[in-house]
């Protein structure tokens, strides 16, 4: 573990031009060793330098601001020497008025407004949804929340129900029923722009439903044993992923090379940017949860074993250039190419090894026409071809699919973009949801017995899968020293996870600081965060309704 530490200095202005130091305390940012040479959490390449966070709170008559200084460190941990010194060209701005306040320090950085507690809460609650599902189909409630870092946010999501014919004629309660539900929950972690993730949120479910339709209308498939039917499901999901990506990339560029217009270049934006994809499908007929992952978003289930102990199990494996299985696959597909994986990235550039879009890792010509021959006014919309590109495609949208039977001990599923897992471990996530349940979904209807400590959670993920997952690395040393603290303030459980993620073990000052940093500066300290939590079970009502939990929902309409 390499720890980059600077100091946080709290200052106050007693009079114009007078600054008084009130106190100092450490503010730390930690990286695991494989992340110190590139931008933490970024799916695009860094500059080979890590940035340490140095802040000072500056008080004024009408505002409180946070001073951020970027110290560029070499891989050896020593201060680098840019042309103007390690910390240079520093100015102080009042961002509300966009005016120069003062030259607090010629060797510090821009001064940024530190949000009030009310403003922090407003930002955390700006994008959240929560619904109780009264369908007696195995899903009791789901919560979704987002916290942008990029502007606009590059993540997207989808929640949708597809009603399908029942193949057994009874529902979970043993009653006659001609229809069952497929619950779709998707998280799409975009990079290089929001265009690919937005397209996935609009179109992926319909592509999957189209491929699943023959299974429900084929008597042979309906009467097949569970193993055969599961294989048909997985094949249909994988086919839909590949078909959609083919339409996104090849379809767009085929139109572009045959008619190279600005309009066709703009319609190719979902092929130019990229997105990871995490899609979970819960089948109410047999309580089966299928998780398909393309990229490095992650799905977990949390539950209680017969002895009353909490457990977590990951249902997906991070597909990145740090995953030995993915590295082996790519090297076998491109034998003899030394640049296939460099610094943990595909062709030294892209962190996820599987993704939608990202045309430049998949083709350099189509129908015999090279993309480099496109007119200049069209190529200006495209991105540079990566170094070491010899035999594309290098990146695929083909998912890895897992199938899990949801039994009574399994309480909920958590899905999130990789930004959450940079800040929290799998065990911490389940412990935080379990703690939230004690207050907001108590089994006995009382909140009097809420314990003070987070529960102990065992990770039952297979060792091989666990070894392939990226571990939390941001602010780890501070979090470890905080003694397992947490914050419990949000009625939306997804927002609860997002609030705790940057808290470094329950520290409100970390939440305030990291939420206050605006885009694009914030991208150096946290990623876009998108979280979905679905609770398994059935509500006391069975009227087919979807009820908004208003205390946990901003002004959004349900998507199910």
Give a label for each model feature:
Residues 1-66, 72-110, 560:
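N-terminal mitochondrial targeting presequence
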Residues 69, 188:
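Calcium-binding motifs, dominated by EF-hand helix-loop-helix domains
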Residues 79-184, 190-560:
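PP2C/PPM-type serine/threonine phosphatase catalytic core
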């Amino acid at each position: 573990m390499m720890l980059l530490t600077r100091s946080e200095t709290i200052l106050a202005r007693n009079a114009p031009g007078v600054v008084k130091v009130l106190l100092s305390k450490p503010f730390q940012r930690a990286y695991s060793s494989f992340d110190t040479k590139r931008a933490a959490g970024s799916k695009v390449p860094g500059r080979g330098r890590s940035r340490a966070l140095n802040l000072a709170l500056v008080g004024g008559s009408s505002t409180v601001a946070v001073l951020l200084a970027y110290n560029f460190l070499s891989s050896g941990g020593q201060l680098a020497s840019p042309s103007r010194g390690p910390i240079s060209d520093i100015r102080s701005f009042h961002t509300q008025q966009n005016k120069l306040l003062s030259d607090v320090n010629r060797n510090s950085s821009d001064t940024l407004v530190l949000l009030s507690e009310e403003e922090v809460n407003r930002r955390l609650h700006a994008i959240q949804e929560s619904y109780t599902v009264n369908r007696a189909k195995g899903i009791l409630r789901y919560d979704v929340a987002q916290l942008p870092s990029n502007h606009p946010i590059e993540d997207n999501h989808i929640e949708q129900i597809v009603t399908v014919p029942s193949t057994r004629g009874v529902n979970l309660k043993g009653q006659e029923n001609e229809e069952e539900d497929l619950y779709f929950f998707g998280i799409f972690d975009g990079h290089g722009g929001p265009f690919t993730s937005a397209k996935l949120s609009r179109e992926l479910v319909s592509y999957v439903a189209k491929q699943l339709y023959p299974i429900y209308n084929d008597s042979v498939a309906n009467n097949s044993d569970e193993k055969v039917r599961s294989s048909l499901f997985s094949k249909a999901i994988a086919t839909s992923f590949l078909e959609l990506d083919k339409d996104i990339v090849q379809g767009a560029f085929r139109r572009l090379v045959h008619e190279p217009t600005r309009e066709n270049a703009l319609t190719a934006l979902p092929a130019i940017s990229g997105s990871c994809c995490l899609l979970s499908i819960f089948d109410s007929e047999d309580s089966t949860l299928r998780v398909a992952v393309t990229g490095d978003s992650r799905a977990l289930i949390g539950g209680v074993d017969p002895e009353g102990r909490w457990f977590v199990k990951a249902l997906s494996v991070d597909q990145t250039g740090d995953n030995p299985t993915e590295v082996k696959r790519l090297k076998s597909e491109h034998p003899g190419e030394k640049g296939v994986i460099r610094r943990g990235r595909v062709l030294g550039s892209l962190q996820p090894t599987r993704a939608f879009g990202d045309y430049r890792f998949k083709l350099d010509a189509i129908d015999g026409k090279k993309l480099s021959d496109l007119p200049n006014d069209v190529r200006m919309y495209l991105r540079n071809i990566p170094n070491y590109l010899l035999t594309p495609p290098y990146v695929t949208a083909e998912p890895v699919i897992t199938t899990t039977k949801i039994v009574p001990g399994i309480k909920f599923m958590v899905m999130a973009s990789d930004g959450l897992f940079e800040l929290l471990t799998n065990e911490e996530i389940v412990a935080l949801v379990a703690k939230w349940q004690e207050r907001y979904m108590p089994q006995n209807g009382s909140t009097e017995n809420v314990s003070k400590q987070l529960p102990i959670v065992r990770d039952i993920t297979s060792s091989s899968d666990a070894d392939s997952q990226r571990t939390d690395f941001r602010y780890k040393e501070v979090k470890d020293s905080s003694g397992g603290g947490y914050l419990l303030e949000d009625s939306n459980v997804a927002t609860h996870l997002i609030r705790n993620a940057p808290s470094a073990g329950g520290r409100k000052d970390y939440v305030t600081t990291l939420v206050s940093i605006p885009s694009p500066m914030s991208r150096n300290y946290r990623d876009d965060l998108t979280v979905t939590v679905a609770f398994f079970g059935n509500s006391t009502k069975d009227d087919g309704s979807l009820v908004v939990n208003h205390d946990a929902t901003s002004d959004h309409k349900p998507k199910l």
